[in-house]
Design a protein with these regions (language model features):
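Structural motif
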Residues: 57-60, 121-131, 187-191, 231-239, ...
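Residue position within the beta-strands of beta-propeller blades
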Residues: 52, 114, 181, 224-226, ...
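Positively charged n-region of N-terminal signal peptides that target proteins for export
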Residues: 1-8
Length: 334
């Protein structure tokens, strides 16, 4: 059920609000953009750019105009991936292979990637991370290919037929040449994708509750939102996960509102603060390895739910939301 829900939420990302991080009450810098009708699946800060991607479109945020600008050529990258009768593609495909790129963006080792899935004529899948290059003039092309084989694939049987599909990666973040993400197999797992070795490792995930999301903290450490659904009402703990030791330590309890729990988390190392959304408000909190500061409510959140994590981009905290039906068309943003 959780796996299905995560896919539905990814397809539903449509609205957003951008919040200034200055001291005092929050100010909504942007909420909505007329006539915008796309479903944002991924947001990343890449160099000095804020990039947002849907299944077949790439957008960049323009601080001067306060608008999203579509990057030309994104939808044609699959042709570059597979090639045609006259031009070879980036991937070396066999007859009967089918390949496509998903709508997510990943940053590892300062490079930008997309995930390609290749399915052969027997229904067996494999994956490659393909570098996305953006030239100074905005032209897009594909670069190096990281072959992950079938390490991200789940195989199922239907009678005499077997088929495989790619598991989704939630809250992807990286340190060095390794990408970390939550992913459902038979259960929720924390995966480490080493691009140098082209390997995928499952890390130990031993916490008292259910991990809801992860976010990068400092080098080699992740923040984890952990909910305890056995409590009534539910309780939420912020944990610090040490990647090298594969251990999680509790930093402290996060506030909840009945069954509403924190979401849209993003940690800003420069400010030493965690930003999140809870019950119609935006919150911030000091975080150190010794514990948590007092949560501070610093603005109203006009959207009902932030799907996925937020991102900090300079002085802005950017969120995406799925409550399109509750927001007037004139306020639509992404």
């Amino acid at each position: 059920m959780k796996k299905i829900l995560s896919i539905l939420l990814a397809l539903a990302l449509m609205l957003g609000a951008t919040f200034a991080l200055a001291e005092g009450n929050v100010t909504i810098a942007v909420q909505g953009m007329n006539d915008f009708n796309d479903y944002i699946q991924s947001m990343v800060v890449y160099g000095d750019r804020l990039l947002l991607s849907s299944w077949d479109r790439l957008y960049t945020w323009d601080n001067a105009t306060r608008k999203l600008t579509e990057v030309e050529g994104y939808g044609e990258l699959e042709s570059t991936l597979t090639g045609d009768d006259e031009t070879p593609g980036v991937l070396d495909l066999n007859d009967g292979d089918y390949a496509y790129l998903d709508g997510n963006l990943y940053i590892v080792g300062g490079r930008l990637y997309r995930m390609a899935t290749v399915t052969d004529s027997d229904g067996n899948a494999s994956n490659q991370l393909v570098e996305l290059l953006i030239a100074d003039d905005g032209a897009l092309s594909l670069g190096e290919v990281i072959d992950l084989g079938d390490a991200l694939c789940i195989t199922e049987s239907d009678g005499d037929q077997t088929y495989s599909y790619t598991r989704s990666l939630s809250n992807p973040c990286s340190f060095g040449n390794t990408l970390y993400a939550l992913s459902y197999g038979d259960e929720l797992e924390l995966l480490a994708l080493n691009l140098e070795d082209e390997t995928v490792e499952t890390l130990t995930l031993d916490v008292d509750g259910d991990v809801q999301s992860i976010a990068p903290y400092t080098e080699g450490k992740l923040l984890m939102i952990v909910n305890n659904y056995d409590a009534d009402p539910v309780t939420t703990t912020l944990c610090l996960y040490d990647i090298e030791n594969e251990e999680a330590a509790e930093l402290g309890a996060l506030p909840t509102a009945d069954y509403d729990t924190p979401n849209g988390i993003s940690y800003d190392e420069a400010r030493g603060k965690l930003y999140y959304v809870l019950s119609g408000s935006v919150w911030r909190m000091d975080v150190t390895e010794d514990g948590l500061g007092e949560p501070e409510e610093f603005g109203d959140m006009p959207l009902g739910y932030a799907s996925g994590n937020g991102v900090v981009y300079g002085d802005l905290y950017v969120l995406a939301d799925s409550d399109a039906k509750e927001i007037p068309a004139k306020s639509r943003f992404f």
